[in-house]
């Protein structure tokens, strides 16, 4: 009688075999070679199964009580060598697995034993690998040369980062309002810190280039971590750190990410005080096979087929079907109970809506988007910084709010309507007051009232008069005398008109 143990059968193929790839902390070194048991959808008759079991080369009995592991390993190795000499394709051996009430025929792939290590071949391989690393470093840095004419940006909480010309990284606080599709702009009222701007050439590469009489090596080196290869550039010369008294430094890692459409900063962290690490994901390095991520290792499949008699019907391997049928019978019983108790329309327990805050989730009731039912949703006005553009360091002209022609041109006056003023976040009453003051101050000359956006998103109304300074001064003096006379007549104190230049500023920012 045969007995089958999947774990022992998998381990007997190559006892002590090592992982073919590099070291990975998440992998178990004792799991190689890897096997995976797969249950095939096809079936095999009992006659064919016993024929395969009897016709294969005798190796050892599945009853481990009658043989030792050492004898089984020696017999298996001898048979494998004899079979592999005449066969180019994979070879299998068959074992019977019993899982009452069924039996399965499992085909186990026979793996070749690893060859003995050759010291000379290993030394040649190491030398070839060193040359390949040097070539890959130069090739990878050449692929990244296009980054020297561009900038990458990354935002993380309070701080934002810019990586420009592939050699300078700046940390700054961005303005709170950034238009869609525009890079972050530094707030001029906050400080910025340079994390690195001077590439540091690896000492090993510089020494090797000097010994060989070659040109200066690229300011990057290739590093290997497990099966993954990536370029590393170290930047120095950053802003002096107030905690350590030394310059800030940063290490930039370039990783190949197949399928990406553009370069992107993955993340930035401060690993130690004023020492940073940044990862750049780029598809450029994928053009060199040396930087491609390793292929996922697949386990060797142990395929098991169900053994059947011709007269028996194949049972279903899907164990979820009876469970689903049992679950489907539960609401039916509840419906029957509800019908007996007189409930005309019992509700399915599995679809019972949940009441959250007075709202039935899943009830498919149309809810109002406003604060009160039956009213349209409220439209909030855009913030003041909504109209800001990418050039936030300078003033920006928005629109002419009101204008008046001189008396020679007819003296016509044009003012935006109340709807347009509200769209610009302006109060019509404030604009009306400003327009009246500008009309009186300009007199017979033409004038205009403009809306200007200041750095930071604030807006300001500015008035301009088409007159010389002498004429404007006379008009101001005349207007001043008229106001003084009116104040004396009424006995009230009124605000005097402040003398200024041709450009008039009105302190109405808070009322806009």
Curated annotation (Swiss-Prot):
A GO cellular component entry from the record: endoplasmic reticulum membrane
Localization per Swiss-Prot or TrEMBL: Endoplasmic reticulum membrane
UniProt motif (Prevents secretion from ER) ranges: 509-512
Annotated signal sequence range: 1-17
Keyword annotations from UniProtKB, A to Z: Disulfide bond, Endoplasmic reticulum, Glycoprotein, Lectin, Membrane, Signal
Subunit-level organization: Interacts with missfolded ER lumenal proteins.
Family: Belongs to the OS-9 family.
Protein name, per record: Protein OS-9 homolog
